[in-house]
Amino acid sequence: MDVLKHNLDELLESSTNYLLLQGPIGPFFTELSAWLKTFHKQVFKINFNSGDEAFYPNSIPQTFAYQGQLDQFDQYLRFFCHQHSIDAIICFGDTRAYHRIAKIVADKQKISFWVFEEGYLRPEYVTLEKGGVNDYSQLPRHANFFLSQAACCSEISAPEKLAKGFIPLATIAIKYYTKAYFNQDKYPDYQHHRILDLKYYIKLWLTSGIKRAYYYWQDRSFGKKVAAGKLGDFFLVPLQVYDDSQVRIHCDYESVDAFLKEILESFIHHAPSALNLIIKHHPMDRGFVDYGHVIKQYKTQYPAFKKRIFYVHDVPIPILLRKGKGMITLNSTSGISALLHRMPVLTLGRASYNFEGLTYQGNLHSFWHNKGLPEAKVFDAYRKYHLSKTQINGSFYSKVILRYPYNQ
């Protein structure tokens, strides 16, 4: 059987004229553009705000500033693609308003549509898929597909450790939002996918730092207790960023708050009496929202659960994955990390990895009593496929390894 061709190879081989829309904050799209040009490709870029310009300056040839309204972007993009014979559109994330319009235009004009995203297999990878990522992924969702592809997968060596943690990301974010905030007059009609207010972020980043220090010793002590096996059996609930597209678009809950309340209700009324529950706050959400008041309400209403429900912030998730008996998530990629540890996973949102053989297919109330494990053979095939096809070693906020052929 033929060896799987990595998506990065297909991206390079299948097109000549590329259009880059919004990339991740930072210099990655500039680096990607330069890499494509070494293969004599034509690369065009559209910037949407001054934060985009900060990392992909308009001085780079064939870079354009879109200063129109959102409802005019469809017409602008259709003409742009026709004028420049675009045969591939590349973006970061497929749920931003401009990118959703671009997907429709691409489909109508038979232009390939490529999406970068944070890694499915973290922390040392980023994702590249054709057609969409996460719930918009075009990949089949059944075990037989991945099992049938296993023989075609390349042998993948250990990745370089390129993820550098929070500080590089914070530095890049400050530069991006400072430029975007103070130069809004240039792009008066731009609609950001999140709040675009520098004062808002400064306040909440400071709050995040204070909370990190406040919870440090408490979380450290709790982590040691878990690592020593002193907490007993527990299920893990990793919360997601409150305004992430995975929450806003790829699930039916109104909010993370509503998701959490449903889990707490079910745990209290249906979980075995010996089971504990650990709710883990998302580290990127620390300064923005706090769910302590929700959890406290349930503990007050049901005093018997005060010592069975725990809310943590910065306990390293690998510690929790090594000891936990199950995970409940909306659709977080931490669910894939749990599967790597052979931890049963229930997804309550829409996730591309939610299918029989990998995740639990029953309901929430019955999951507390689940004794089954993910099928190791299925997960191994799933992981090998993505490493051979969709995952690229690197971090958007430090370095991404771009090479051709990729699997060498």
Question: In which residue ranges do the predicted regions lie?
Answer:
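A nucleotide-sugar donor-handling region in carbohydrate enzymes
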Residues: 146-245
